[in-house]
Each structure stands twice: as structure tokens, then as C-alpha cells.
A protein has these predicted regions:
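Flexible "arm" and connector segments at domain edges
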Residues: 1-64, 68-97
Length: 97
């Protein structure tokens, strides 16, 4: 599934489940929280901190999906076509790197 379809899927889910988009600042705070959860798993599972027993059942993939969901929400709210932006960024990185 491409990014444009993911953006559409998130928008449909929000509109069909009786929820709404939080404002952009709230979603930015949500994104920070979700990235923190990813960081906790990585730092404890792959870094120098020991992984607590309560952290062993945390799913990195689910937490990354939470990050992606909020990023898609922010893109939808601000009118960003992430597919176009991602393709442009990859072309730039390919040329530059």
C-alpha cells in the first residue's frame, strides 16, 4: 500500500469511527509521546539499559505503527501529500548521497 492510500485510510477511519482529528499541537505532543515509546523499547532492548520484565512484551512494530498513524494524521490536517514529499526526498537523497 502506498502512502497516499495510507493517508486516505486514516482519514476514512477517523471520519467513520466518530472521532475527530486533534489539533495540530496536540497531535505533535502525541507524536512526541509515541516516539518516546519507540525510544524506550530500542534503548532497553538494543542499547545499554537493561530491559525490564514489563517491557519485554512491548511490540516495536506496534509502536512504530502508532508513530506512523500520528504522522499521517498531521499530514492530513496540514494538507501535506506525504507520497509526493517522500518521493521527492528519496530522489534528493539518491542524488546527494
Amino acid at each position: 500500500m502506498d502512502i497516499k492510500n495510507l493517508q486516505s485510510q486514516v482519514d476514512k477511519w477517523i471520519n467513520n469511527h466518530g472521532v475527530r482529528y486533534f489539533n495540530e499541537l496536540t497531535n505533535m505532543a502525541q507524536l512526541t509521546e509515541e516516539v518516546g515509546e519507540v525510544a524506550r523499547i530500542i534503548s532497553r532492548r538494543y542499547g545499554e539499559q537493561s530491559e525490564k520484565e514489563s517491557d519485554k512484551n512491548l511490540d516495536l512494530g506496534e509502536e512504530l505503527a502508532d508513530v506512523m498513524f500520528v504522522v499521517l494524521c498531521l499530514a492530513n490536517q496540514t494538507g501535506v501529500d506525504l507520497q509526493k514529499s517522500f518521493d521527492s526526498k528519496m530522489a534528493l537523497k539518491t542524488k546527494r548521497d
